[in-house]
Amino acid sequence: MKRPSGRAPHQLRPIRITRNYTRHAEGSVLVEFGDTRVICTVSAEAGVPRFLKGQGKGWLTAEYGMLPRATGERMAREASRGRQGGRTLEIQRLIGRSLRAALDMSKLGENTLYVDCDVIQADGGTRTASITGAMVALVDALAVLKKRGALKGDPLKQMVAAVSVGIYQGEPILDLDYPEDSDAETDLNVVMTDAGGFIEVQGTAEGEPFQPEELNAMLALATQGIRELFELQRAVLAD
Amino acid sequence: MKRPSGRAPHQLRPIRITRNYTRHAEGSVLVEFGDTRVICTVSAEAGVPRFLKGQGKGWLTAEYGMLPRATGERMAREASRGRQGGRTLEIQRLIGRSLRAALDMSKLGENTLYVDCDVIQADGGTRTASITGAMVALVDALAVLKKRGALKGDPLKQMVAAVSVGIYQGEPILDLDYPEDSDAETDLNVVMTDAGGFIEVQGTAEGEPFQPEELNAMLALATQGIRELFELQRAVLAD
Amino acid sequence: MKRPSGRAPHQLRPIRITRNYTRHAEGSVLVEFGDTRVICTVSAEAGVPRFLKGQGKGWLTAEYGMLPRATGERMAREASRGRQGGRTLEIQRLIGRSLRAALDMSKLGENTLYVDCDVIQADGGTRTASITGAMVALVDALAVLKKRGALKGDPLKQMVAAVSVGIYQGEPILDLDYPEDSDAETDLNVVMTDAGGFIEVQGTAEGEPFQPEELNAMLALATQGIRELFELQRAVLAD
Amino acid sequence: MKRPSGRAPHQLRPIRITRNYTRHAEGSVLVEFGDTRVICTVSAEAGVPRFLKGQGKGWLTAEYGMLPRATGERMAREASRGRQGGRTLEIQRLIGRSLRAALDMSKLGENTLYVDCDVIQADGGTRTASITGAMVALVDALAVLKKRGALKGDPLKQMVAAVSVGIYQGEPILDLDYPEDSDAETDLNVVMTDAGGFIEVQGTAEGEPFQPEELNAMLALATQGIRELFELQRAVLAD
Amino acid sequence: MKRPSGRAPHQLRPIRITRNYTRHAEGSVLVEFGDTRVICTVSAEAGVPRFLKGQGKGWLTAEYGMLPRATGERMAREASRGRQGGRTLEIQRLIGRSLRAALDMSKLGENTLYVDCDVIQADGGTRTASITGAMVALVDALAVLKKRGALKGDPLKQMVAAVSVGIYQGEPILDLDYPEDSDAETDLNVVMTDAGGFIEVQGTAEGEPFQPEELNAMLALATQGIRELFELQRAVLAD
Amino acid sequence: MKRPSGRAPHQLRPIRITRNYTRHAEGSVLVEFGDTRVICTVSAEAGVPRFLKGQGKGWLTAEYGMLPRATGERMAREASRGRQGGRTLEIQRLIGRSLRAALDMSKLGENTLYVDCDVIQADGGTRTASITGAMVALVDALAVLKKRGALKGDPLKQMVAAVSVGIYQGEPILDLDYPEDSDAETDLNVVMTDAGGFIEVQGTAEGEPFQPEELNAMLALATQGIRELFELQRAVLAD
């Protein structure tokens, strides 16, 4: 088996996380998984949605978008079509759940964090890149809130990162780019904490159904890849 | 550990599938997983969406809805709010992918199958009940199409069924009802083929992250539960 | 003249009203006029719309929908089209006005009743079946509110029921099913109180205009039919 | 009983119909029922909606709107709210059905007539004024189409006109203005042909239910009023 | 050069402003620039939008619409299409900005003025006619508010009027009608105060780019034309 | 007078145009006017909109968007609000008109060019930066189309660039950043061709009206600034 990308099965693409990528947001990161490039910002606003009012807790919500020509063919702009598609809603719900798992909301105070992940260039794995990058922007945003005295403690429970794995020509591979993803039999997105637990596991058989042992092989590959991503996050945040 | 429902950890709720539930659709089923009740219809129309035209293949697409008072609190009607929510879109995409896995589209001819799953009463597990019930309606619809001479062979590759599993007070349990689902630490939806492969595996940690061995225990439970569902589908279709 | 249904001109279809059809709503009924089947729920919520705030009065509002394949041909789901059609809005306005006529709002307290009529299977007369069935669900819902101590007296002023009549091949007939309705020259929907007054009279000439004497003959037929419906409502509520 | 308007019970408001009110439309009329003023245009376009293609028949469809400050309180503009309300849709469906009753579609050729009724100033009875005025614009539009050689005969089967009647302080009155309408117990809109048949009868009890004899008294009053409207239409068209 | 309209280059069309055109609005005007006819109403409501609350200042906002057959070809009704087009939004923003320039908001009190400009018949220059006519309706509305004691002084800082100019066959012309506008190389809309300053200058090269000296010639023509419009406004308001 | 930015009145911000910024689009540029950063892509698709079919001509259309946190305060995402705002539509119409002025559509062949300008970071002047940057992406896209043999000649008639000017504390200044723009009395956007003609001139008095001589001073400043921008475009394209 040879990957279209030429990478070894367990090899991540070159990953880059650039902090303070834009100026206005409390946290702002450009994350690159190879040719996949996503701007992740975290914006803090005082106040919480109605269903949380008066409970002394905070909230985090996420939105996801792609520039129309982030992809090989131009896709219609969702703002001009007048609605977000099912894929967009599915992804932004995943990002929101994943990052909420990183936080202790009772220490966030009555603040809302808006995570915006906007894909500038897509080459597979945009949702997992978004989670991994937004996690860094989230840490930066919490530091800003702390300086403002807006927190009731340290809301950061754990780090979160994500990667995709798949079965390609019968073998598990890590961090699929678009050509690999298009041909893979199975596609699995995995979100983990730095303590080694799973937050989300979403696997889909595109062609043939997958077997328990294939699932386990993919999860092992994902676990290893995410461990590398945690190191990278730590290194970037240490700068 | 005692389940709120009083069931044993590996015990399904009483499942009932009533065929020919309504009169107009090519396939029409009422599926009940305990108090969860869903009407599943399959409607066949000649022709395919534009992206498939001229390829001699068919298509299947799914939509999902809940009656406003299917739930404990009345929810705003999506038709009057003017858009389907993210949860709805996510579920109907899952149903569509799952049922497409049952079919060989090249034998369906240029026909489109519309699967509609409408929840009359919700008590947890509506998406997995929808898939399991709609599979039966799909078989009935194919029989109607066959009689009409609209098929190019037998499009049915395999049966598909689905169930939810979770971790409740540290233990894996099968087929969660709403009170169990609300308190579970982890929620996992599993879609399988009758040959024993996975079509979809979607797990979410609601509270604590889950570990690989917990995932495997849940998958084993799901595999056993789905086996029972396949027997039930077969028995119902044999009538 | 022979009706397609084989019924006598003044003969209703078999009518069935099943109370407590679903579990969550304050009132919940399945109403069947022959093959027309509608789920009617009444949901009570504390509070009133803004235009009524502070007046000590309650409110009732209605919504109507059809499952996509309730009809012979599948109709696009209004939730996914992003708007309710004119027919839907017209019918739900009619249901709301009709049921409000049954109530003394000043005794309802500051509560809002949401009536949802969802057609599972359509065979003509869905709006009149909805009104007749929802009236029973409304009585049940009021009993629940009374037990909760949420009322300021008995808001039930009078019972309301509805039926369709028409001119078919020159003769007035009662309670048209779909094939009769499609061929009728005139279609008239009548809503009455159990004291014998009219709440709504909506007649439309589909083909030839109708004459005053035809209108009176249809109204007489409707009056008789609705009297039977009131007996049926009473019998069902007495159980 | 004294009407707020000071009119006798059977007395219409001053009615004026101004033809060729605007320049572009095939038919264009300003209709005034007292202070109610509506611009009615009829626009002809070659072609028919998809469901009629290839049948050699024409079609007529109607739309209705109010300028935001046509009423005592400004109402939000439907174009900026992003949807037409239920009342609007109900009225434009009524106008469309009423005017289609005037035409033999098989003689219209494959043309579509768009009737637009836009209320400039509202003082009760806008829907019946719209129908009565649009009928005149329709005759003018047919004359234009005839000159263009676009017709397959004379599509005009009969004239149509409409008026509202009601029960006010226990007595039937004709052609209610807004203050009368607000206080009436019953409101009845009647559409008739010049041959004396009913096209639409839509009665609603706003307060007390109405009795058959009240309905008949109202219909008699409407019949007389509409007869006057037909004379007026004829006089205006003769100019 | 001969204008299609036969007018001299610096000649306005016949302008008419009819006050109190409809009955309900605080200010209501029919403005006619030749065959262009627009109803302008100004509606006053107590209260201001949220972003202004508690500042003791008022607000003015504008909306613009066209009747579907105001134009040579019928245009789809924006209310039924479900959104206002870009041209509509652009024009109503221009009208709002222009009329706000006439007012000292701090003297308006916490009132909101809604300006509605609805084009009954279009023949070029609808936006500039709207501004010029709405200005008169605004003065009338302020007089009503003054009588009600709702003002904190005289909010009227200055009068505002607008006209279009263009380059037609190489020469600047004033107040273009539709045929002239369609053929003009450049189209320039100018809004001025009666003290002679510019509020808005919006020029677009439809064909060839325009030169500074052409711009200045057009501005001179506009200045002269707007001076005539101010005289006309004054005369109308003096009646 | 001292500009908040410290720049001389006639001084542009540092301008940077980075070609080939993303990989998929036929033309793709990152344009920076100081802290204002916009991604401009040009996508080519075969075919034209319906109103142009069969004329052998091409078309260019533009869309504009801002990332939610491109600004100081996070703005709601237009895709999730379900409609583009008036400002967005106004700007994208301006961009489209400006770039169409650069092209001879008859030489473009039946191709449509989609220009997408997405603001990553806003600091004033986003619309003029968009036009200036998209012009470069357009040239690159035309080169790609030429290589593909999709053109019928060279469609590039002239270069186009744009800048904003304003009156700040009584003096004309060039290329306003956000703090300058917020305080300026007048804001003028100017689009020119490299032959020195005006394509668009859009001036708005935010505070005091502006005088003809102020307008001329601003235009002179804009002309000089745009000349620098043309040099910059040329230099960038020469690389």
UniProtKB/Swiss-Prot annotation, chains A, B, C, D, E, F:
Keyword RNA-binding: yes
Keywords for this protein: Nucleotidyltransferase, RNA-binding, rRNA processing, Transferase, tRNA processing, tRNA-binding
Reactions catalysed, as given in the entry: tRNA(n+1) + phosphate = tRNA(n) + a ribonucleoside 5'-diphosphate
Main EC class the enzyme belongs to: transferase
Residues at which phosphate binds: 87, 125-127
EC numbers for this chain: 2.7.7.56
Entry's Gene Ontology molecular function annotations: 3'-5'-RNA exonuclease activity; tRNA binding; tRNA nucleotidyltransferase activity
CDD domains associated with the record: RNase_PH_bact (cd11362)
Coiled coil (UniProt feature): none
Keyword tRNA processing assigned: yes
Domain of life: Bacteria
InterPro entries on file: ExoRNase_PH_dom1, ExoRNase_PH_dom2, ExoRNase_PH_dom2_sf, PNPase/RNase_PH_dom_sf, Ribosomal_Su5_D2-typ_SF, RNase_PH, RNase_PH_bac-type, RNase_PH_CS
GO biological process: rRNA catabolic process; rRNA processing; tRNA processing
Pfam families the record matches: RNase_PH (PF01138), RNase_PH_C (PF03725)
Described purpose of this protein according to its UniProt entry: Phosphorolytic 3'-5' exoribonuclease that plays an important role in tRNA 3'-end maturation. Removes nucleotide residues following the 3'-CCA terminus of tRNAs; can also add nucleotides to the ends of RNA molecules by using nucleoside diphosphates as substrates, but this may not be physiologically important. Probably plays a role in initiation of 16S rRNA degradation (leading to ribosome degradation) during starvation.
Subunit-level organization: Homohexameric ring arranged as a trimer of dimers.
Assigned protein family: Belongs to the RNase PH family.
PANTHER family: EXOSOME COMPLEX COMPONENT (PTHR11953), EXOSOME COMPLEX COMPONENT RRP41 (PTHR11953:SF0)
Protein name: Ribonuclease PH
